[in-house]
Amino acid sequence: MHAYICTACGTQYPPSESSPARCTICEDERQFVPLGGQGWTTLEAMRLRHFNAWRQHEPGLIGIGSQPTFAIGQRALLICTPNGNVLWDCISLIDDATVTLINGLGGLKAIAISHPHFYTTLGEWSRAFGGIPVHLTPTTGAGSCGPTPASSCGRARR
């Protein structure tokens, strides 16, 4: 079984024998279903074709984005503070190099998701950093959240 990722928006879905028939994020009025239909990949396949690039915007604020660009080109922001680091939004690709670099900067204390287009692989990110909480705003809580460490969306999860 594979946890399929929508190639249009980057959202990961729970493991299944075959790719989902549709993507609820792409069917939302704020997104679109590609003219050619939904496309799907897996995290394992992404790791063979993509890598994460880092850009320091200012001290304590680092942008992380996948290259070549994937889905709608999301980027996450790593906010580094003396009280712990927070990842603002997620990107689909999480790999060993990214986990190693973030751990070298002090690890992660929490993840905050601002919009459904950043659900991506939030469960994978949480698990990679010890099951840290994922905070969703009330407006981002509806819809598919993919394979996550908790059973429901719309509130902080551990």
Language-model features, listed with the residues they occupy:
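Residue-level preference for short coil/turn positions at secondary-structure junctions
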Residues: 2, 19, 57, 72, ...
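Conserved beta-strand hairpin/beta-sheet module of binuclear metal-dependent hydrolase folds
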Residues: 50-98
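Active-site HxH/HxHxD metal-binding segment of metal-dependent hydrolases
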Residues: 98-158
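Generic recognition of short, well-ordered alpha-helical segments
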Residues: 18-21, 74, 123-124
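Active-site environment of divalent metal-dependent phosphoester hydrolases
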Residues: 12-15, 29-33, 71, 95-96, ...
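Short, flexible, glycine/charge-rich loop motifs used to bind or transfer phosphoryl groups or to couple energy/partner
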Residues: 12-13, 76, 100-102
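N-terminal juxtadomain amphipathic helix
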Residues: 2-60, 64-66
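Helix N-terminus capping/helix-initiation residues
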Residues: 41-42, 95, 137
